């Protein structure tokens, strides 16, 4: 009998960061195995500053490995080479080819995350031969006093941002959000952002780790903690307008707030005011999901991906054909079972079960016809992510913004930047399969 593709889990990979903590190990129960130069494996302890858990990544060196089943030991890139559109769906494969289009992480932001920004697909492709980086943060937990900085609290200029980053006063113009469990933030390319104070995040993004670091809270002045900054490279890709409040969702939404924020996908305009300055609407809406009684709230629907929050109170019958894409589920609370209708060699039908618990991620290949989602705990919450082929480039970049600032010596920068990208010994760029900056 021909073996069929099945829901896939991958071995998580830890990434130590100066702003990381212990929540990925202590709260989510992650077990990170690391190998030394001799191939000896050890368990990474909770005493390490682990900032990221890479759950699903097709990033060259960072290539996720299947954890279970008959495909165990194969990487996601090997699966893409072998199964092509059976993994991601025909339309997605037609656009992205053998590159798996999304990157899934958990973040433990225990200290100040650098003030940073990501490019869009157009800039990333033209300058660095990479995908851009649109992303959504889903807040799984937040300590009292935790902060997210997203965009600016007023319109500013490139010159003001440049000066403030150099002077260490940029915090004064950053828009501050005090996150709570269940909140969601869509970080569009060009949005300057940072965070601090104990935040556990599920992050869904394009398959790119390209980050421009603008300010590092003083770490850059200490030789022991200094990391490269990319302010010059990023100055013309930043959205300098005041933060668009429609990109942040307080969760859960109830009553008047939910009604105010609801928006129909097919409508050209909504009541939230997000179109007043010509920005695209990313408002959140409730929708029926499949044929069950559950409700999926769409957190973001953008050209690159669509992410919904699914409060799983009853079993749901999911048909993958509806999405035309693979489906990724991230369990942020409780536990669930993916039950796949299967047939034994003797022709008898049965359900094959695949469990997903809090802090786990599963990839459902597009080739699977249908399956059931069954909650195992009373309060089970899943994030559901599917991919949309990109049809239009991001439009936030103002073509009139000067790429260079007065009084600064940029001689040779434009010509030298392309050369720098290919020489890691003379540049802050780090290579992980594609040319990119590292956060």
Task: Describe the function of each predicted region.
Residues 317-318, 334-340:
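Short beta-strand segments in beta-sandwich/barrel cores
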